[in-house]
Curated annotation (Swiss-Prot):
Protein's name in the database: Holliday junction branch migration complex subunit RuvB
Role according to the record: The RuvA-RuvB-RuvC complex processes Holliday junction (HJ) DNA during genetic recombination and DNA repair, while the RuvA-RuvB complex plays an important role in the rescue of blocked DNA replication forks via replication fork reversal (RFR). RuvA specifically binds to HJ cruciform DNA, conferring on it an open structure. The RuvB hexamer acts as an ATP-dependent pump, pulling dsDNA into and through the RuvAB complex. RuvB forms 2 homohexamers on either side of HJ DNA bound by 1 or 2 RuvA tetramers; 4 subunits per hexamer contact DNA at a time.
Entry binding sites for Mg(2+): T68
UniProt cross-references to InterPro entries, sorted A to Z: AAA+_ATPase, AAA_lid_4, DNA_helicase_Holl-junc_RuvB, P-loop_NTPase, RuvB-like_N, RuvB_C, WH-like_DNA-bd_sf, WH_DNA-bd_sf
Summary of subunit composition and partner proteins: Homohexamer. Forms an RuvA(8)-RuvB(12)-Holliday junction (HJ) complex. HJ DNA is sandwiched between 2 RuvA tetramers; dsDNA enters through RuvA and exits via RuvB. An RuvB hexamer assembles on each DNA strand where it exits the tetramer. Each RuvB hexamer is contacted by two RuvA subunits (via domain III) on 2 adjacent RuvB subunits; this complex drives branch migration. In the full resolvosome a probable DNA-RuvA(4)-RuvB(12)-RuvC(2) complex forms which resolves the HJ.
PANTHER family in the record: HOLLIDAY JUNCTION BRANCH MIGRATION COMPLEX SUBUNIT RUVB (PTHR42848:SF1), PTHR42848
GO cellular component: cytoplasm; Holliday junction resolvase complex
First-tier enzyme category under EC: hydrolase
HAMAP family (alphabetical): DNA_HJ_migration_RuvB
Domain of life (superkingdom): Bacteria
Region (Large ATPase domain (RuvB-L)): 1-183
Region of interest called Small ATPAse domain (RuvB-S), as start-end residue ranges on this chain: 184-254
Length: 348
């Protein structure tokens, strides 16, 4: 049975449909990613003045940081059409050809999870990006022939959470690579405050700070927490969300002051109580938690590592002193974390 979706998951959830109303519509409304915004603004303005298609753009970064939103803003700022799809959806070369041949001049085609394109589809994409041509094989066997189709000059905007899985030929064809970083608490406060205004609920500065601190540096999570806190405020007939309401709501949702949820705390406490703080292998943790290895490595661990609660060492996963302090546990006296993980690669 599939586990319930986590409140603090950066991945898109089915209940995130309300997230659309909170999204900024222009670069000037987009909070955070200052350098990325500044560069994009220049590139867009230059392309607009020349009347040319913007060079191909690649957004790289963890989920929930605004890659899709920025792609939509790019098309809106350019005043052109926007088509969106994702890597897994484009199963064969014909699917990609259908998308590309329907694009108008200077349109934006957005491909999310572009690292999941099949090699066969990538081969068709290369000449389309570079020469704005499609090279297709029509027919089979001796009757097969190559056909070239001219395309409108378009902008491909790709998004990926795993840049290392992109092939070099594909990566090199993006003239504008942009890396998105986690947001600061101050930036998330601005996002929460704007979101509250859009949703028509009052928000005090300390209420916005409380939500922002627990949003794990991710706007998608901040918006999700805001919508749930608004429910608590509405049920209490409160005209505004303050720190007390936000704290009560988020505590009821099991999101603690550091943004950790029940799964995070279970992971940390399992290592602390069952394995003396580690090191312990990821396969052992997968068995102990009844979770697949991929879920542990891609969903649970990144934020714990980012916050300094966990180390990946050659000998396994190791809790830091910070983790024991957060759990309210005493650190084992015979442990010396500073001597572990200084050399070698992460464990398999």
């Amino acid at each position: 049975m599939k586990p319930p979706a986590r409140m603090v998951s950066p991945e898109r959830r089915s209940d995130d449909v309300g997230d659309t109303a909170l999204r900024p519509q222009q670069l000037s409304e987009f909070v955070g990613q200052q350098q990325a915004r500044a560069n994009l603004s220049i590139f867009i303005e230059a392309a607009r003045k020349r009347g040319e298609a913007l060079d191909h753009v690649l957004f790289v970064g963890p989920p929930g940081l605004g890659k899709t939103t920025l792609a939509q803003i790019v098309a809106r700022e350019l005043g052109v059409g926007f088509r969106a799809t994702s890597g897994p959806v484009i199963a064969k070369a014909g699917d990609l050809a259908a998308l590309l041949t329907n694009l108008e001049e200077r349109d934006v085609l957005f491909i999310d999870e572009i690292h999941r394109l099949s090699p066969a589809v990538e081969e068709v994409l290369y000449p389309a990006m570079e020469d704005f041509q499609l090279d297709l094989i029509i027919g089979e066997g001796p009757a097969a022939r190559s056909v070239k189709i001219d395309l409108s000059k378009f902008t491909l905007v790709g998004a990926t959470t795993r840049a290392g899985l992109l092939t070099n030929p594909l990566r090199d064809r993006f003239g504008i690579p942009i890396r998105l970083n986690f947001y600061t608490v101050e930036e998330l406060e601005g996002i929460v405050t704007r979101g509250a205004r859009v949703l028509g609920i009052g928000m005090t500065p300390d209420g916005a700070n409380e939500i922002a601190r627990r949003a794990r540096g991710t706007p998608r999570i901040a918006g999700r927490l805001l919508r749930r806190v608004r429910d608590f405020a509405s049920a209490a007939d409160a005209s505004a969300i303050d720190r007390a309401i936000a704290d009560h709501a988020l505590s009821a949702l099991e999101v603690d002051a550091a943004g950790l949820d029940a799964m995070d705390r279970r992971y940390l406490s399992t290592i602390a109580l069952n394995y003396g703080g580690g090191p312990v292998g990821v396969e052992t943790m997968a068995a102990a938690l009844s979770e697949p290895r991929d879920a542990i490595e891609d969903i649970i661990e990144p934020y714990l590592i980012q916050c300094g609660y966990l180390q990946r060492t050659p000998r396994g996963r190791l809790l830091t002193s910070h983790a024991f302090k957060h759990l309210g546990m005493a650190e084992p006296a015979n442990r010396d974390p500073s001597q572990i993980g200084l050399f070698g690669n992460d464990d398999d």
